């Protein structure tokens, strides 16, 4: 993720273009989800059917905004996130179903950066993950990092990729 958002979206587009098959699904965690959204907007591929965003700050990032204002810490936010925050939201083509998975276990950067709205996953607030184009969303009791290793999250991602909706109980 050392490249900018546009470069990362282009690289993902080239990877998708080189991938065989009629149906392609994407899963992106945090900035990876923003790269997937940027790719969909810039390089739409009709084979991309479903996308799951895990803890992606679609509506902005309080933690990143604080880091960007703090001398010496701006680099921690990363170029892709800095570009996402600075650019207008790209319109998304309607061919892909989008699911948003957020966490509500507040462990991480948000514990030392004041003002992160609750509920949050310790890095991104649930409110920041929302995306109007999403067909479904779910919040699970995991932190930003835990969602990568959580069996429950994996099951929910699989459910969305299979059916276009999460398992709400």
Residues covered by each model-derived region:
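A short, charged, and often flexible helix/loop element on the N-terminal side
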Residues: 1-2, 140
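Serine-dependent carboxylesterase/thioesterase catalytic core
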Residues: 2-97, 116, 121
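C-terminal catalytic-base region of ester-bond hydrolases, centering on the histidine
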Residues: 95-169
């Amino acid at each position: 993720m050392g490249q900018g958002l546009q470069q990362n979206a282009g690289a993902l587009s080239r990877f998708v273009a080189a991938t065989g098959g009629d149906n392609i699904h994407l899963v992106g965690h945090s900035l990876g989800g923003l790269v997937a959204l940027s790719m969909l907007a810039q390089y739409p591929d009709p084979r991309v059917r479903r996308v799951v965003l895990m803890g992606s700050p679609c509506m902005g990032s309080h933690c990143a905004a604080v880091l960007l204002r703090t001398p010496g810490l701006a680099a921690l936010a990363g170029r892709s996130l800095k570009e996402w925050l600075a650019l207008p939201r790209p319109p998304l083509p309607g061919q892909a179903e989008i699911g948003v998975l957020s966490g509500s276990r507040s462990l991480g950067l948000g514990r030392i950066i004041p003002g992160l709205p609750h509920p949050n996953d310790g890095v991104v607030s649930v409110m920041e993950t929302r995306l109007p184009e999403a067909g479904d969303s779910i919040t699970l009791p995991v932190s930003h990092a835990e969602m990568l290793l959580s069996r429950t999250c994996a099951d929910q991602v699989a459910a969305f990729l299979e059916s276009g909706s999460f398992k709400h109980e």
